[in-house]
């Protein structure tokens, strides 16, 4: 194992072990709808600390697949901008033509427009980092029966879009997506943390960013692999107030929590200190309280700014 200095994190510097062997590091991004904003905050910190520069392959399920593609554009600012634009209207887009045809699903038109704006399909195909996306193949009764892992670089732009739509096709909300004569839905239904396809490639070092608060990854299937796992320190919500919640405040909270959790996780992993580890739950709660307070301040400031601008307009 090599060693590398990281930049300053809160207090002092951290000397960390760098997990870069020949095949590099596998980055695994779980699915979870609106909870995916959490991964944006985590990725920001991991990139700033140099832990992603040796990632050679990325896998994602559902919104994790979207984040994998956004991250591969190598522009964190643009990734944040994309998430600013993914809102309730994007997710719950109603197409009157679909309703007229008795297709009782939300449209994917707004999501496709976001893909076109922020994801360069040619760059995906040219990128040295492979991207694998999990999709769930349906049987004749339209139930998920088999997970498939698609390497995006093997397909043309149109098929890549279909794979991405399939991996994010939540049941009830969206139509199943047909690819090569077969129907597919959300990849998270059968494998929400697609580690296996990367392991099968020979990857033995992983960074996994999940969505389930407090989860401990069971690594028994991969006994010879090393893992850095980052999961939310606080619950990100259930189906309604979590997965389907793309409101601005929810996204802001999750991004900030992702940043805080990543910083603490790295300190625990690479600068082990018994006292810090024992205090970690308390520090996590303090970080949560800080986020809530900061969001209140931001909301109050924005409200005052809007009122001031409104009053100024009355005099103009």
What is the predicted function of each stretch?
Residues 3-59, 69-316:
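Patatin-like phospholipase
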Residues 60, 64:
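Gly/Ala-rich beta-loop-alpha elbow adjacent to hydrolase catalytic centers
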